[in-house]
Amino acid sequence: MTWMTTASGGRFDYGTPDLAEIHIADIAHALAQICRFTGHTRRFYSVAQHSVLVSRIVPPEHALAGLLHDAHEAYVGDMATPLKDLVPDYRAIEARAWSAVATRFGLNPVLPPCVKQADIIALATERRDLLPRDGRVWRVLENVVPRFERIEPLGSESAEALFLSRYREIAAAARRGVAAEPMPSPRYPRLRRALRALFVGDGPI
């Protein structure tokens, strides 16, 4: 068996992914329940919230690529990069899943450099706000300045709602023929509750 059951009851085949089985609601739900850094954060912090952060850092015209740059992890998980280097077969599976997701949402599988740059800025910010202060030097973060705004981790339901809200904002902007502007951070509980009420429970789109 080379397939898995998705949150909506569909099927994702790792060997030959069916684009019709890739839904933004499944991606949002799964990423909202996957913790960054394989769970070694001071508080739960999801890949979904990380993805929204990256979508805000990139230029507006690349917001969708920023939001979905880790969308394949909804199907293959978020393996730590040092471990990926020891499991070459995983990278091939990851690349196949990413190619399918990118095609499904009209993205070039080769992401623009600004997405990688934004990912590194997000990493620097996450290290400052969420990881233990171990004093070690991360070469990948040399000369990288974290964002001024601190990260307030959201629970999985709020992160899922935030991801879907951001996706719909970007999609609406694309339909109008304009680039999506970064949306404000939902740091207030009332806004979080409103987002949850609006978007949690949506079916696949």
Regions found by a protein language model. Name each.
Residues M1-I205:
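Metal-dependent phosphohydrolase cores
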